[in-house]
Amino acid sequence: MDPDEVNQALGHYLNDSESGELVVEDSTTVQVTNPEARKTGDKIEVYYSRKTTVVSPTNSDDEEGEFCSDSELLPAQGGHRSRATSFAGRVRAGSDDEMNPKHTVLRYRRKKGGQWREVNAQGTPDKRKDDEDELEVDVKEDRSEQTGIVTKTYEARWKVLKYEHLPEWLQDNEFLRHGHRPPLPSFAECFKSIWSLHTETGNIWTHLIGCVAFFLLACWFLTRPDNHIQFQEKVVFSFFFAGAVSVSDSRSPSTPSRVIRSTSSRYSANSTIWESRCSLSARLFQPKITYIAMVCVLGIGAIVVSLWDKFSESKYRPVRAAVFVGMGCSGVIPTIHYIITDGVHSLFADNSFHWLLLMAFLYLLGAALYATRTPERFFPGKCDIWFQSHQLFHTCVVIAAFVHYYGISEMAFARLNEQCPVR
């Protein structure tokens, strides 16, 4: 079925109107995500929205109507199973409370090669675990009892998709089999998807929770009295909080993955700069500036690589992880410098280096899980929603950021209390 046939089918099922009703407005929006389907014969995906405004007699004796599916929601034609949806809905007025707006959500599911069936919100997982697709239809009616004007809105869309049904640019992990969020037509739809359950839900919320937590921590830290935390320390720490909040908030529903990687690179560079600044702050000016400049150059290089479209492909996932790890490992050089000048004991006793080691371990662990796609590689289809590698990577990064904050705050307070020697 090509896009023209989809439009015709959708119009056929929704063009019925009540006798005596005068149609004032009837607008339909159909967005086809694969316009080349008529040439290639591939499956297509359709986002369908229709708004109908009619004037009906206010003294009508119509009875409450029903919602029905769309002729089994367009079964296969021409040997290709269609990805398009339509919905035949008819709402009739008659009761006293129908002047209030109505909102009904209907859900349909189907197994592979099967017909669509209507399900309720309490459908048991056992009956739904083998389903291939879920279709969600929003039906809204706004009726004015005084004017007789009725506005009906129908919106049909897929809630989740299988991996094979995603466009190529979203096929990043073939071990996540079901529950993918489809391409959405607007930012509003992307934002609403925060509250739905799909493969990106855990990725979104691990970052959003971290963002809120760091924002609250920043508010507490920056509002401390100056006799506890001096103003210049607040200014310097504000850069750390800005980096932590930005990397935590970078997983909005519409954020491209390359922007996320560039934000992670900025945060990694920020971490190393803080190590150099706090551990060498009482030392000669030149080495500290040299290390900070070195990290800035490496960070810019990592951001450039992260924003390069070529590295957005799934096959470069290990390369992306290696860039992230390499950026973090740049902190080894100032650490070796400190060991040479002050020894290992001072590194741990005066600079809380054990916390920075824990931070590095969490970074490496998260990057390794992300690069190897563990554990979903060993359990395909079992980690589609929870405990997938990307979620674990985000969790490791957020925890590492809190560990990093604690470590550098200990280093900063030790410097303020003049516990580190000046040379």
From Swiss-Prot:
Cell compartment(s), UniProt: Membrane
GO molecular function: signaling receptor activity
Region (Disordered): 54-140
Stretches with biased composition (Acidic residues): 60-69
Record's keyword terms, sorted: Fatty acid metabolism, Lipid metabolism, Membrane, Receptor, Transmembrane, Transmembrane helix
UniProt main location, coarse: membrane
Domain of life: Eukaryota
Residue spans crossing the bilayer: 202-222, 235-252, 289-309, 321-341, 352-372, 393-413
Membrane topology: Multi-pass membrane protein
GO biological process: adiponectin-activated signaling pathway; fatty acid metabolic process
Classification via InterPro entries: AdipoR/HlyIII-related, PAC
Cytoplasmic side: 1-201, 253-288, 342-351, 414-423
Extracellular side: 223-234, 310-320, 373-392
Keyword match Lipid metabolism: yes
Protein role: Probable receptor, which may be involved in metabolic pathways that regulate lipid metabolism such as fatty acid oxidation.
Homology family: Belongs to the ADIPOR family.
UniProt-recorded name of the protein: Progestin and adipoQ receptor-like protein 1
